[in-house]
Design a protein with these regions (language model features):
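Rossmann-like AdoMet
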Residues: 1-28, 41-42
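SAM cofactor-binding core of SAM-dependent methyltransferases
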Residues: 24-104
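Hydrophobic beta-strand segment of the Class I
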Residues: 48, 114-117
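Generic detector of well-ordered alpha-helical packing
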Residues: 51, 77, 118, 142-143
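Conserved glycine-rich SAM-binding loop
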Residues: 54, 120-121
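Structural motif corresponding to alpha-helix initiation and N-cap regions
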Residues: 99, 121-122
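A short acidic, Gly/Pro-enriched loop at the edge of an enzyme's catalytic core
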Residues: 107-114
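C-terminal substrate-binding/active-site "lid" region of AdoMet-derived donor-dependent transferases
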Residues: 122-190
Length: 190
């Protein structure tokens, strides 16, 4: 059986172009992007958030699953990247690109989907959890798979990953996105 190549949404292509032009090398990978699209699509009237817009690749994947009644708010601390990412979504009033610290998102919380790829993930994990609505989905990528429990990174217990996987307010799991990378996906308990 021959598999057709999966189409990449046009705004993702535009954001990848911005990343290339800006020399930005930390965009989310397509495997995570498809997960983001699925999460956004699961909350068609939700408030979707992203910390760490970068060039807008993750934002574009979230946008590709955005329902007509949903809103998407993302924040990037680099002014130039935020400006360029905002231009990709300038024609869609459902999307807001903020410039500054990740805490700017708090005024838009609680979130039905939160892709935490920037501020908050490491420096305020409890604050990240508190931004989720009951039943809200949290996606954190850029982990290295670990066959051990508790999970390890570079020979040590990965306290950050362990925090999210065992948090009492979350039902969480780790999924393999590529052979060399994984993501933590969690839902806030009702």
């Amino acid at each position: 059986m021959i598999m057709a190549e999966r189409a990449v949404p046009p705004r993702v292509v535009a954001a990848e172009r911005v990343a290339s032009e800006a020399g930005f090398k930390k965009s989310c990978i397509p495997e995570v992007g498809r997960l983001l699209r699925l999460a956004a699509a699961a909350k068609p009237h939700g408030i979707i958030a992203e910390s760490g817009t970068g060039s807008g690749v993750g934002t574009a994947w979230l946008h590709s699953g955005l329902g007509a009644g949903a809103r998407l708010v993302t924040v990037e601390r680099d002014e130039e990247l935020a400006r360029r990412a905002a231009s990709i979504f300038a024609d869609d009033k459902r999307v807001s690109v903020l410039t500054g610290d990740w805490r700017l998102l708090e005024q838009h919380a609680p979130f039905d989907v939160f892709f935490c790829d920037g501020g908050g993930k490491r420096d305020d994990p409890q604050g990240v959890v508190e931004q989720l609505a009951p039943g809200g989905l949290l996606i954190l990528d850029d982990f290295t798979p670990s066959p051990h429990w508790p999970p390890r990174f570079e020979g040590e217990v990965d306290e950050l990953r362990l925090f999210y996987l065992t948090h009492p307010a979350l039902d969480a799991t780790e999924i393999l996105t590529t052979p060399a990378s994984s993501a933590v996906v969690a839902a806030r308990r009702l």
